[in-house]
Amino acid sequence: MDTKQTMFALATAPFNSAIHIIRLSGPDVYRIINQITNKEVKPLGMRIQRVWLIDHNQKKVDDVLLFKFVAPNSYTGEDLIEISCHGSMVIVNEIIGLLLKHGAVQAQPGEFTQRGYLNGKMSLNQAASVNNLVLSPNTTLKDVALNALAGQVDARLEPLVEKLGQLVMQMEVNLDYPEYTDEQRELVTMNQAVVQITQILNQIVVGQDQLQRLKDPFKIAIIGNTNVGKSSLLNALLDQDKAIVSAIKGSTRDIVEGDFALNGHFVKILDTAGIRQHQSALEKAGIQKTFGAIKTANLVIYLLDARQPEPDPKIIARLKKLKKDFFLVHNKADLVQQSFQVSISAKQKQIQPLVDLLTQYLHQFYSVEQNQLYLISDWQTILLQKAIAELEHFLIKQQNCLFFDILVVHLRAAHEYILQVLGKNTNYDLINEIFKHFCLGK
């Protein structure tokens, strides 16, 4: 990455829409912008300026708004202008052509945030949280990313790295002046501090197992006999005709998927082949896919016909063997007088009892410990696990070893790993690995 270059990127999705935003950042922002506008644009004065963009023949390209951010008070820490133009991709491509012609270069994924990090506008954890925030599939992970963006990770780890640094310094002083050192007493004090730091780091790392399962889409598999209304339920949940609804038994032989949002959580729902005893070869293949979908699902909706409300005990046994949570839902409730615990009419789109139950389940599934610090990125967890391993080596060795020059190696290594989590002493390979997963314009 060459920070001497002025970069640009389309910050909005690349298709026709109401407006588009093109970001321009770097040392030559005002030189470039003044070559393609009908009036002078200065870093002082109005922060929002309306101008015409023009080409080399003075032909008008678009009527735009320029949002000006003057260094160092910008996202990147550089001079930055956001061009708000009309939403045609024809206009966007013309503007990009003008920027390229006058010396701007296409930004790499995550380069705006990376420059912000390098220019001291945010820590590495805050920078990484930006992408996690953009990609968060549910409100829980969104909140975790926002906490990191607010500096929660740095605030929790900085006292630990400071304490470790003091311990390393203390051991190095003792190595230089051994005649003034009571090694046994020093080690007792250090041992207490290292135990405390290790416990805190372990608490942080343990929480990642809970968070990991929330990163994948929540999957619901709809299963049941043929012609019980599974496709109608899928369509009712999606509020669109995604699956073919037919009175012919065995119509669905492949898995039909659909995505919908429920109370801030994205859900992937799978409509599966109907299960019955007498099947054609094609239906048997479809049923195998059904059981495959059950294995990958977080939750199973076992749909029953309210006129034949008893579930198949073999299917119930299989669900329990797989340790799958499941709901027994009685469909076609409009055709009977009897009321069940969860009764719906998918065809009539009367599914609110099921929606309420799903909402309650999702709330419980996505609930996390409020006071727990969560690291949303795997690289953070890996580095902390390495730090913990070094601290544990220290605790084991200090029981039988009084040589500070051996023990201090482990404290230095642990200190270094936590510094890397904080974005200090971080190698460029890790930095590039973090930012390459960002989207363009961020």
UniProtKB/Swiss-Prot annotation:
At the top level, the lineage of the source is: Bacteria
**Which cofactors are required for activity?**
K(+)
Which residues are recorded as binding GTP? 227-232, 246-252, 271-274, 331-334
Query: What EC number(s) has UniProt assigned to this enzyme?
Result: 3.6.-.-
Location of the protein in the cell: Cytoplasm
Record-listed K(+) binding positions: N227, S246, I248, S251
Keywords annotated in UniProt: Cytoplasm, GTP-binding, Hydrolase, Magnesium, Metal-binding, Nucleotide-binding, Potassium, tRNA processing
HAMAP family from the UniProt entry? GTPase_MnmE
Q: What is this protein called?
A: tRNA modification GTPase MnmE
Which organism encodes this protein?
Answer: Mycoplasma pneumoniae (strain ATCC 29342 / M129 / Subtype 1)
